[in-house]
Amino acid sequence: MVAYLDVAATTRVDPRVADVVLHWMTEDFGNAGSRTHEYGTRAKKAVQEARTFLAGTVGAKTEEVIFTSGATESNNIALLGMAPYGEKNQRRHIITSAIEHKAVIEPLVHLQSKGFEVDFLEPGLSGRIATESVLEKLRPDTLLVSLMHVNNETGVIQPVAELAEELRGTPTYFHVDAAQGYGKLPEDLKAPIDMISISGHKVGAPKGVGALVTRRRGWDKTPLEPIMFGGGQERKLRPGTLAVPLIMGLYEAAKVFQEGQPRWEREALAMRERMLAALGKTRFHINGDADHSVPHILNVTFDGLNAEALIVRVKDQVAVATGSACTSASYTPSHVLTAMGLPDGVANNGLRFSWFPSQVADFDPEEFAATVVRMQPDAP
């Protein structure tokens, strides 16, 4: 069986989650917006229970969570939804990083075409944006800072909790794309972050569900305007019939992950140590700051090896990736590794390993390393 080391792209749905989803699809299948019968009442109550739990995982209030189809939609609502407020108040400056997911970069490029000024900060070889570099760019007209929690290609953790404290009390709003970090580093997201994007399928929930947390500042709501129209659901910020089975799947997945997080972290770190020990027999370089990375994502380049050729060679052994699944059809160098200042030869050949410990029992790092050694040309 091919070992799966691509959980940064998506995870297997936990069987307990699948059972919950099936229940809400086939038994309690009511519309949460139906108020005239018990099917709808049960669905609405269940959604509110899920909302309360998710809010608690990031230290938010129940009413501050809206359900979406995933982190891409959450990012778009957060970024494009802030634009009218920025225009009205002559605050058209936004700060972000050049290593963000395309679901952040592309909405911001769109805002540039509408007259917004966006600073895309580059992190350097560490892959980590310094808090000071963000603060140095702040201006009186800065509307928003948007920074990912964990980079999806390198696994490098960004200093979002520290930055949130620095931005507290300023008029600048702070958005965090937590698609890769939610559940793994729970304390970071309890910092005073105005908006948090969450993805379900990165923690064992089905694809097609996520959330956007929009915290109040005192009594004031985050000044978001809807980017879609057609109903009053989710505070009118995300109209449409609620996908109750998927929401309940996200709820169950978040509970399961929260309960198992300490063990998951220990086992993920143990797997990382096994990987690094085996790869030590090859000639390789870690891309990104290994001291500020999540334990389950590792991005490396092997000297003299083409990453695509290696993937083809080991396709019957292990499933790995060269970068983000959302851009894997593109043959351009990784925009993340390029923004870190790595040359095209490295940026073209970064290989990302990402794992959940429970899903890699069949993977032998030593066997993989032996394949790499056989493929690598002799050292000059």
Where are these regions (language model features)?
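Pyridoxal 5′-phosphate
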Residues: 1-380
